[in-house]
């Protein structure tokens, strides 16, 4: 679970250090006219990811409550693998922007459901340690992963950072499948908006 939160930290924040590289590559006409405008336009990749988080967190968490948590976590980590791999291969700014929005969708649900899974795995008296363990991946990502991803992206092309992130999520998917215990869903649980 912490491996996935490490990947989430990387995919969310590595873009910031690579905006000039991304803008130069996928917005060449804008870059030729104004580098500042190209970087500002590339900044939409950050905004669209954040929008995906806002839309996806409550939607996915609500829908996923009915299904076994280990399967939901596998699905979320798989989605993060695929959407980051798409960012690596897609040729145009518009398609990359769409992949960034899609990559943001599982973000909040991964943290929310992952924290519940970790708390259940450790049981009473150690639930907070389980939640902290999941969030440790995010902390380590901000200290190690993002600078490393930015360095790799600047040295070998910005896309390498996203295939690295996709690889991290692939590893997270495998470890979740192997080590997260089965937990039944709650078929009766739904989201309601009372007001």
Model-found features: residue ranges?
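Extracellular/periplasmic helix-loop-helix junction of adjacent transmembrane segments
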Residues: 20-54
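Conserved MFS/SLC helix-loop-helix module at the cytosolic interface between two early adjacent transmembrane helices
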Residues: 55-91
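MFS 12-TM fold signature
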Residues: 79-84, 103, 168-172
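Residue-level signature of mid-helix packing/kink "hotspots" within the transmembrane helices
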Residues: 13, 49-58, 142-143
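Juxtamembrane intracellular "pre-TM" segments in multi-pass secondary transporters
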Residues: 181-195
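Helix-loop-helix hairpin linking two adjacent transmembrane segments in secondary transporters
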Residues: 95, 124-129, 133-181
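Cytoplasmic helix-loop-helix junction between adjacent transmembrane helices
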Residues: 93, 99-137
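Extracytoplasmic
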Residues: 3-28
């Amino acid at each position: 679970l912490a491996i996935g939160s490490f990947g989430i930290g990387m995919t969310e924040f590595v873009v910031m250090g690579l905006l000039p590289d991304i803008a130069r590559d996928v917005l060449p006409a804008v870059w030729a006219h104004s580098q500042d405008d190209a970087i500002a336009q590339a900044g939409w990749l950050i905004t669209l990811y954040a929008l995906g988080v806002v839309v996806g967190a409550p939607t996915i968490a609500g829908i996923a409550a009915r299904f076994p948590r280990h399967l939901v976590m596998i699905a979320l980590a798989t989605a993060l693998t695929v959407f980051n791999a798409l960012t690596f291969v897609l040729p145009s700014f518009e398609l990359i922007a769409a992949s960034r929005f899609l990559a943001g969708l599982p973000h909040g649900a991964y943290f929310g459901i992952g924290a519940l899974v970790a708390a259940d795995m450790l049981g009473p008296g150690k639930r907070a340690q389980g939640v902290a363990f999941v969030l440790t991946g995010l902390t380590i990502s901000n200290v190690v992963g993002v600078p490393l991803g930015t360095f790799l992206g600047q040295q070998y092309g910005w896309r390498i950072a996203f295939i690295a992130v996709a690889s991290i999520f692939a590893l997270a998917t495998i470890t979740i499948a192997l080590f997260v215990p089965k937990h039944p869903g709650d078929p009766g649980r739904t989201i309601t908006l009372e007001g």
